[in-house]
From Swiss-Prot:
Pathway of action: Membrane lipid metabolism; glycerophospholipid metabolism
Organism listed in the record: Methanococcus aeolicus (strain ATCC BAA-1280 / DSM 17508 / OCM 812 / Nankai-3)
Keyword terms, alphabetized: Cytoplasm, Lipid biosynthesis, Lipid metabolism, Metal-binding, NAD, NADP, Oxidoreductase, Phospholipid biosynthesis, Phospholipid metabolism, Zinc
Gene expressing this chain: egsA
Name used for this protein in its record: Glycerol-1-phosphate dehydrogenase [NAD(P)+]
E.C. no: 1.1.1.261
Residues at which NAD(+) binds: 81-85, 103-106, 112
């Protein structure tokens, strides 16, 4: 069954509507999952905090958590990626309603029913309500807000990869989900490009709307396909290499996906699947919001970027423009052609 949010709030001081939404949903005993930095946003509400005891990498939360979870009728995730991921995972695992309250807008996980770990998708609970308080989000680091653009433009190449897979492998494909996903991305690109760099006051609001729409598209499709393709494989490949080599690089998902999108869009351009204008607009929109477009901005040297691209197709069994993989020699040429190295 497709589950989409019943309530979506995107406005200044939106968090003040939390009690009203809980009342409308007949939810009386929420469990709030948040972190040390984001706890302040929910401190005026008399709810129970539970964060440090939960680790989604383990098969089961600890005994204390299990004994307490029955006392709550919903989970509220307040924070960035981790708090919301943990919240919707726990909500799914223990059959609770989930409310998402993002404190930044760096990826579509704020609305999707999926958690991604090193390229693998873990099923989670779709939010029944999303409260995006623009006062809070606008105060989040600019780097995170620019990373959100990278996660949104990736929908463009994700949809191209999905359609390619349908043609070459007969993978099930939803035209409506694909159009919805691409439209969300293109509208944000057009907004960014049509406004002066110093006149993007509405960008956070437009970005949040796009990220929520992207997350909902995943729910409708029942798959991450509309929002995750070869560009995400590249990002996950970077994550794996970083961890393996124990590199001190704080890679942000959306930033890596943005660069991955430039790569994927270039490959689709070569095959005639997009125009040169569409390719250039992806890169220009990223630059305009301050997102990285070259490898050095991420902190990776060229050899790591080459390895990540050459091994990206191995991350998961998903047919993309990378197909069965590309050689390191070809990967280097692509990265040079796109000015990433």
């Amino acid at each position: 069954m497709i589950t989409t949010p019943r309530y979506i709030v995107i406005e200044e001081n939106g968090i003040n509507l939390l009690n009203d939404i809980l009342l409308k949903l007949n939810l009386k005993n929420p469990l709030v999952i948040t972190g040390k930095r984001t706890k302040k946003y929910i401190s005026n509400f008399d709810y129970f905090y539970y964060f440090d005891y939960i680790d989604i990498k383990r098969n089961e939360p600890n005994k204390e958590f299990i004994e307490n979870i029955c006392n709550f009728d919903c989970i509220i995730g307040v924070g960035g990626g981790k708090a919301i991921d943990v919240g919707k995972y726990i909500a799914y695992k223990y059959n609770k309603q989930f409310i998402s309250i993002p404190t930044t807008a760096s990826n579509d996980g704020i609305a999707s029913p999926i958690i991604s770990q090193q390229g693998k998708s873990i099923t989670a609970e779709s939010p029944i309500a999303i409260i995006a308080d623009l006062n809070i989000i606008k105060k989040s680091p600019k780097r995170l807000l620019s990373a959100g653009m990278g996660d949104i433009v990736s929908n463009i190449t994700a949809v191209l990869d999905w359609k390619l897979s349908y043609k070459e492998t007969k993978e099930p494909y939803s035209e409506s989900s694909a159009i919805f996903s691409k439209t969300i991305a293109m509208e944000l690109v057009e907004f960014v490009l049509s406004n002066d760099k110093n006149n993007l006051e509405e960008y956070p609001k437009k970005l949040v709307k796009a990220l929520i729409g992207s997350g909902i598209t995943i729910s409708i499709a029942g798959s991450t396909r509309p929002a995750s393709g070869s560009e995400h494989l590249f990002s996950h490949s970077l994550d794996i290499i970083t961890k393996k080599l124990n590199l001190n690089i704080n890679g942000i998902h959306g930033e890596q996906c943005g660069i991955g999108t430039i790569i994927s869009a270039y490959l689709h351009l070569i095959e005639g699947n997009i125009t040169i204008g569409e390719y250039e607009n992806i890169k220009l929109s990223l630059e305009k919001v301050g997102a990285p477009t070259i490898g050095e901005q991420l902190g990776y040297d060229k050899n790591i970027l080459i390895d990540a691209l050459a091994n990206a197709h191995k991350i998961r069994n998903r047919w993309t423009i990378l197909r069965n993989g590309i050689s390191k020699e070809k990967a280097e040429k692509i990265l040079k052609k796109t000015d990433i190295i």
